């Protein structure tokens, strides 16, 4: 079963990688990854929302889209979505609606931008705000590299969305494993393409598997797992994979690079980790010890693959840090 899932994930990742290579043109692969990964992630959120809410409403004989349009259901559905998913997706912003708009020749890249802003905006002031704050910022839909005019940018992003839409991937509990793993493989392919710098945000599977197994020897489930140099969360997710579903109570992670920090949160969500079950920080672990607040609740497991190759300068802050002594 595991071997079959791995094969499916690898094949899915290869197809997505082919899309990236076909459509990025002269754009740097490291930059184009923000668009392909962002589009895949948006599709996941949309289809996960519909699947989750439709299942919830099936006994009422009404779909998610119908419920949002029905005054008797609207507020309840929105409150439930915010509480359990962390965000609200309006029917017009669902993946299927955007694809229909593209096929009808009525789509503009500005529609996609508004849809993303609406999703992130729905989390403001909610418990989920930190999980979604500026999550799509690296997917700059106004970037001139996509096209000098709105029409050019619309044409390219439409091609990306249509090609991604042609690839079947599911969002049921079983299918999320395949999709999440494919997402990891795709991140790995971009990391390989980036060369040495790719190691800053992705730990090779063989290394992360070994670390996860060593860190959890004798443990069947854990209250928490922490990675202070999390990158794209590959180590934490390997711990999740090794222990099994619902065996990790909470994930803690910190990552300095802003783009990688966004990828970290996307990756956790893509692997079915609810926003309530992870706490992340976008900071320098050596300079800003956000984990100091957690000293009263020791982490069960800590894993890390620090960026050893990065240059760093001596700082007086470090001389008084017990961790450096």
Residue ranges of predicted features:
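Non-catalytic, mostly N-terminal accessory regions of nucleic-acid modification and defense proteins
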Residues: 1-210, 214-215, 282-285
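Generic secretory/membrane-interface signal
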Residues: 64-69, 221, 278, 319
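Conserved S-adenosyl-L-methionine
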Residues: 197-304, 309-311
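Short, flexible, mixed-charge acidic loops at enzyme active sites
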Residues: 313-317
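Conserved small/polar residues in nucleotide/adenosyl-binding loops
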Residues: 318-325
């Amino acid at each position: 079963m595991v071997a079959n899932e791995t094969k499916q994930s690898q094949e899915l990742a290869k197809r997505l990688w082919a899309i990236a290579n076909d459509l990025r043109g002269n754009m740097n692969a490291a930059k184009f990854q923000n668009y392909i990964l962002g589009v895949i992630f948006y599709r996941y959120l949309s289809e996960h929302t519909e699947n989750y809410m439709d299942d919830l409403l099936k006994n009422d004989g009404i779909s998610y889209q119908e419920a949002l349009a029905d005054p008797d259901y609207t507020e309840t559905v929105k409150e439930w979505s915010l509480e359990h998913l962390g965000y609200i997706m309006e029917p017009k912003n669902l993946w299927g609606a955007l694809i229909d708009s593209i096929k009808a020749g009525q789509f503009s890249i500005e529609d996609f931008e508004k849809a993303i802003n609406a999703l992130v905006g729905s989390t403001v002031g909610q418990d989920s705000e930190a999980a979604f704050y500026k999550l799509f910022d690296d997917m700059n839909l106004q970037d001139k590299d996509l096209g000098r005019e709105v029409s050019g940018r619309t044409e390219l992003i439409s091609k990306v969305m249509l090609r991604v839409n042609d690839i079947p991937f599911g969002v049921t509990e079983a299918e999320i494993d395949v999709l999440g793993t494919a997402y990891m493989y795709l991140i790995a392919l971009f990391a390989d393409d980036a060369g040495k710098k790719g190691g800053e945000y992705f730990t090779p599977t063989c290394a992360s598997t070994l670390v996860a197994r060593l860190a959890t020897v004798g443990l069947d489930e854990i209250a928490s797992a922490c990675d202070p140099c999390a990158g794209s969360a590959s180590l934490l997710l390997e711990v999740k994979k090794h222990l099994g579903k619902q065996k990790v109570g909470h994930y803690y992670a910190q990552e300095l690079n802003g783009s990688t920090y966004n990828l970290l949160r996307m990756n956790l969500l893509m692997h079915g980790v609810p926003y309530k079950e992870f706490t992340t920080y976008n900071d320098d672990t050596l300079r800003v010890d956000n984990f100091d607040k957690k000293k009263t609740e020791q982490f069960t497991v800590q894993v890390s693959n620090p960026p050893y190759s990065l240059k760093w300068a001596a700082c007086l802050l470090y001389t008084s840090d017990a961790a450096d002594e």
